[in-house]
C-alpha cells in the first residue's frame, strides 16, 4: 500500500486487507477461473479488497502454486472493460502507467490526453519508477519514444516533466517568486509573440509550493489568473499540457475530479480515462477526489459511476471509489477549503472582459447602407451580405447605418429586414440592430406577455445587468411600452419572487468594496434563513427580507466576502445550500445572483450549454445571450465554455444549429478555440 507522507493522513480508498493470506487468495482465484465460465464476483471481490502490494504477492503465490501467470489467466477469462480494469489493478502502479503510455503512442495517432494526464500529475519518484518500468517492460527508452511521437514545445515540456527533477524544497524565496512572476509576464503578456522556453522552465522545474505563491502573486500583479495568460499566449496540445500542469500544482485531486466528471458526462463514457484514474488514484488520493467531486458537481462520484456504468465493471469501480458521500451541499473540511479558495480567486481576479464584436475599422455607414439595400432589393435576399455586415459592426455603428439608411432611401431598415428574413435568423439580426437597453426591454416584455411567464429570462436579465444597464433598460421600457418596468413586473409576478425582481429592477446595487464586519453579519443572516445556523434569531419574514436585501443590493466584492464568511461559519457553500433548502423561482433567482457574483461569464456559459444540450435547441436563450453579450464578455464566456465542457462554443453551435442562423451565430462567436 502506498505510504502517505510523514505526518499526513492516508487518503486512498483501498487498504491492506487484514489477515491477508496470498496462498488462500491464489487458490480462490484459481477456483473462480476453473471450469466452464468464471466467477467474476469472486474475482472482483478479492482484487478490490487487496492493496497493490498484496496483489503482487498473490501473483507470486499463483505462479508458485500452479506454474501459471495470473494476469495471463485473467486476460483469458475476462473480457472488455472489466478485463482492462482488473488487469490494471493487478499491475504495479509504475507498470500500469508504462502500459498506458505505450498504448498512447503506439499505432496510428497519439493519445495526447493520456500523455498529458500522466506526465502532468506524477511526482518525481513516480516519474523515475515509470521510466524504469517502461525500460523493463518494453526494453525501450521512454524519452526516445516520446520524442519520436511528439513535436514542438509540447514535446519539450513532456521531456522536462519526464526527468522528474521538480524542486521539492518547501522553503520559498520571495525574491525568486517575484522574479518568476516578472519573467512569466514578460514572456507572455508583454511580449510580441511568446517566449515558451520561460513557461517550460518555470512550470516544469519549480516546486509546487513555490509555484502556488507564483500563481497568487501573478494574479495580484496582472489582475488575471495564470490560466488566462496561458490560454491567451499558448495553443494546441502545448496549451492543454501547461493548463494541466497548473491544475495539478494547484490541486492534483481537483484535476482528477474534473477528468472523472468529463469522462462520464454527456453521451458515452470515456472508459479508458475512467479506468486509468480509478486504478491509479485508489491508493493515493481517492477520498480527496471524492470530496472535491461532490463540491464541484453537487453529486457524489459514487452516484455518477452508478448511473453511467453497468455489470461487474460498475461493481468494481464502485468498490474502488470507497463508498458514497452525503447529500450535496455539505462539506468535509478539505472540500470546504476548496470552495473557500474558489471564492478567494473570484474575489482577487481583475478579469478583463472582452467581447467578440468590435467596431469595424474604416467604417463607412454610407457603403453599408447601400450594400444592405442592394441585398434586399429585387427577387430573393442576399442573406450572406446581411449577416456579414451586421455581425461585424458594433451596436453604435449599426445605429449609424439605420440612420443613414433612412436618410438615403426614406425607408426603415428594421422594417425592410423584417420583410426579407424570417425565423431564428430574423430574431438574431433584428436583435443585433436594436440598442442594447431596448433589446433587453423587449426580451423582458416578451417574457411577461401572453399565457405564462418566462421566469428564466426575467432572472437571467435582471440578475446579471449592472446598475447603469438596469437604469437604461427602465428608460427604454417606459419609452417603448408606455409603462414602467416595475408596474409590468408587479402585474405579472407574485410573492417573494416579485419582490426580488423589483428590487433588482431598481438598479440600486451598492458599488463599493467589502465591509468585513458587515459581511460577517450578512453571512449570519444567510445561515439563519437557510436554517443551518446554531442560534436562529428574529422572525422568518424579517430574515427573508434581510436575505433578499443582501443578495439584491450589496456590491459584488462585498458579496464574495459574505460567501467566504458563510463557508467559514457553517462549513457549507451558499450556492449548494440555496439549491437544497429553497425551491421554485425564488431559488432560481438567488442561485443566478450567486453564480453571477462568483463568475458571470461562467453563468452565461452554463446557460448556453443548456440551451443546446439534449433534444431540441432553446433558440430564444441562445439568441438572447449571443446578442446581449457579444460586445461585453462573449470571449470570456467562450473560454469558460471550453474549460468546463471540454468542447468549444463554436463546436457546440456548429453541432446544434444550421443554415443562415448557424452562420450568423458563428460570426458572433468570433472564432474556434
Swiss-Prot record:
Q: Where is the signal peptide?
A: none
- N6-acetyllysine modification, residue list: 63, 68, 75, 81, 306, 370, 418, 483, 620
**Which residues are annotated as modified residue Phosphotyrosine in the UniProt record?**
30, 201
User: How is the polypeptide modified once translated?
Assistant: Phosphorylated in response to growth factor stimulation.
GO MF term set: calcium ion binding; calcium-dependent phospholipid binding; calcium-dependent protein binding; cholesterol binding; GTP binding; identical protein binding; ligand-gated monoatomic ion channel activity; lipid binding
Signals that turn on the gene? By Epstein-Barr virus (EBV).
Q: Which family does it belong to?
A: Belongs to the annexin family.
Q: Where in the cell is it found?
A: Cytoplasm; Melanosome
Q: Report the protein's function.
A: May associate with CD21. May regulate the release of Ca(2+) from intracellular stores.
Task: Report if keyword Acetylation is assigned.
Answer: yes
Q: What is its main location?
A: cytoplasm
**N-acetylalanine: residues carrying this PTM:** 2
- Domain of life assignment: Eukaryota
* Additional notes on this entry: Seems to bind one calcium ion with high affinity.
Mind telling me which GO cellular component terms the entry cites?
collagen-containing extracellular matrix; cytoplasm; extracellular exosome; focal adhesion; late endosome membrane; lysosomal membrane; melanosome; membrane
* Gene this protein is translated from: ANXA6
Question: Does the keyword Calcium feature in the UniProt annotation?
Answer: yes
The record, for InterPro entries, names:
Annexin, Annexin_repeat, Annexin_repeat_CS, Annexin_sf, ANX6
Name a single GO biological process: monoatomic ion transmembrane transport
**Name of the protein:** Annexin A6
List-wise, which residues carry Phosphoserine? 13, 422, 537
Domain notes per entry: A pair of annexin repeats may form one binding site for calcium and phospholipid.
Query: Pfam families annotated for this entry?
Result: Annexin
Extent of the Annexin repeats: 20-91, 92-163, 175-247, 251-322, 363-434, 435-506, 521-595, 599-670
Amino acid at each position: 500500500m502506498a505510504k502517505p507522507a510523514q505526518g499526513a493522513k492516508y487518503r486512498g480508498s483501498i487498504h491492506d486487507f487484514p489477515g491477508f493470506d496470498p496462498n488462500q487468495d491464489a487458490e480462490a482465484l484459481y477456483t473462480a477461473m476453473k471450469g466452464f465460465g468464471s466467477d467474476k464476483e469472486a474475482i472482483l471481490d478479492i482484487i478490490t479488497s487487496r492493496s497493490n502490494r498484496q496483489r503482487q504477492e498473490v501473483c507470486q503465490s499463483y505462479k508458485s502454486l500452479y506454474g501459471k501467470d495470473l494476469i495471463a489467466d485473467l486476460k483469458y477469462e475476462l473480457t472488455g472493460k472489466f478485463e482492462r480494469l482488473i488487469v490494471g489493478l493487478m499491475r504495479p502502479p509504475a507498470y500500469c502507467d508504462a502500459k498506458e503510455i505505450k498504448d498512447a503512442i503506439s499505432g496510428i495517432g497519439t493519445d495526447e490526453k493520456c500523455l498529458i494526464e500522466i506526465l502532468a500529475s506524477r511526482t518525481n519518484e513516480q516519474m523515475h519508477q515509470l521510466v524504469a518500468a517502461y525500460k523493463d517492460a518494453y526494453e525501450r527508452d521512454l524519452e526516445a519514444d516520446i520524442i519520436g511521437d511528439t513535436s514542438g514545445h509540447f514535446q519539450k515540456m513532456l521531456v522536462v516533466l519526464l526527468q522528474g527533477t521538480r524542486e521539492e524544497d518547501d522553503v520559498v524565496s520571495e525574491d525568486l517568486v517575484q522574479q518568476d512572476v516578472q519573467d512569466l509576464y514578460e514572456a507572455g503578456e508583454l511580449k510580441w509573440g511568446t517566449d515558451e522556453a520561460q513557461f517550460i522552465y518555470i512550470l516544469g522545474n519549480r516546486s509546487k509550493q513555490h509555484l502556488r505563491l507564483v500563481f497568487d502573486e501573478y494574479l495580484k500583479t496582472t489582475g488575471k489568473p495564470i490560466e488566462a495568460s496561458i490560454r491567451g499566449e499558448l495553443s494546441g496540445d502545448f496549451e492543454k499540457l501547461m493548463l494541466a500542469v497548473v491544475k495539478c500544482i494547484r490541486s492534483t485531486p481537483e484535476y482528477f475530479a474534473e477528468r472523472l466528471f468529463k469522462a462520464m458526462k454527456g453521451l458515452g463514457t470515456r472508459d479508458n480515462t475512467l479506468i486509468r484514474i480509478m486504478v491509479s488514484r485508489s491508493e493515493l488520493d481517492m477520498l480527496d477526489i471524492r470530496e472535491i467531486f461532490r463540491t464541484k458537481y453537487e453529486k457524489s462520484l459514487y452516484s455518477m459511476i452508478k448511473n453511467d456504468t453497468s455489470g461487474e465493471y460498475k461493481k468494481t469501480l464502485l468498490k474502488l471509489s470507497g463508498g458514497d458521500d452525503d447529500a450535496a451541499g455539505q462539506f468535509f473540511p478539505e472540500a470546504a477549503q476548496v470552495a473557500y479558495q474558489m471564492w478567494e480567486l473570484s474575489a482577487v481576479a481583475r478579469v478583463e472582459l472582452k467581447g467578440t464584436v468590435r467596431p469595424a475599422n474604416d467604417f463607412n455607414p454610407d457603403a453599408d447602407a447601400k450594400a444592405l439595400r442592394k441585398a434586399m432589393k429585387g427577387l430573393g435576399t442576399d442573406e450572406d451580405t446581411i449577416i456579414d455586415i451586421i455581425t461585424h459592426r458594433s451596436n453604435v455603428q449599426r445605429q449609424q447605418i439605420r440612420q443613414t439608411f433612412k436618410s438615403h432611401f426614406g425607408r426603415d431598415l428594421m422594417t425592410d429586414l423584417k420583410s426579407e428574413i424570417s425565423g431564428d435568423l430574423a430574431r438574431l439580426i433584428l436583435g443585433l440592430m436594436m440598442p442594447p437597453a431596448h433589446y433587453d426591454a423587449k426580451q423582458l416584455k416578451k417574457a411577461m406577455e401572453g399565457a405564462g411567464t418566462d421566469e428564466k429570462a426575467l432572472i437571467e436579465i435582471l440578475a446579471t445587468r449592472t446598475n447603469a444597464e438596469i437604469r437604461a433598460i427602465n428608460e427604454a421600457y417606459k419609452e417603448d411600452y408606455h409603462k414602467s418596468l416595475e408596474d409590468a413586473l408587479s402585474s405579472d409576478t407574485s410573492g417573494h419572487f416579485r419582490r426580488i425582481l423589483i428590487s433588482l429592477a431598481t438598479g440600486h446595487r451598492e458599488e463599493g468594496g467589502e465591509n468585513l464586519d458587515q459581511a460577517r453579519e450578512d453571512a449570519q443572516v444567510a445561515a439563519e434563513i437557510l436554517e443551518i445556523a446554531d442560534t436562529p434569531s428574529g422572525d422568518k419574514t424579517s430574515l427573508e427580507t434581510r436575505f433578499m436585501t443582501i443578495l439584491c443590493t450589496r456590491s459584488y466584492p462585498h458579496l464574495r466576502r459574505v460567501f467566504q464568511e458563510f463557508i467559514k461559519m457553517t462549513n457549507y457553500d451558499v450556492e449548494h445550500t440555496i439549491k437544497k433548502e429553497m425551491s421554485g423561482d425564488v431559488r432560481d433567482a438567488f442561485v443566478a445572483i450567486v453564480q453571477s457574483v462568483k463568475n458571470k461569464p461562467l453563468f452565461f456559459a452554463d446557460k448556453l450549454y443548456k440551451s443546446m444540450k439534449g433534444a431540441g435547441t432553446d433558440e430564444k436563450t441562445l439568441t438572447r445571450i449571443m446578442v446581449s453579450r457579444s460586445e461585453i464578455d462573449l470571449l470570456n464566456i467562450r473560454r469558460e465554455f471550453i474549460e468546463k465542457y471540454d468542447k468549444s462554443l463554436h463546436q457546440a453551435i456548429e453541432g446544434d444549429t444550421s443554415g443562415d442562423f448557424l452562420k450568423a451565430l458563428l460570426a458572433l462567436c468570433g472564432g474556434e478555440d
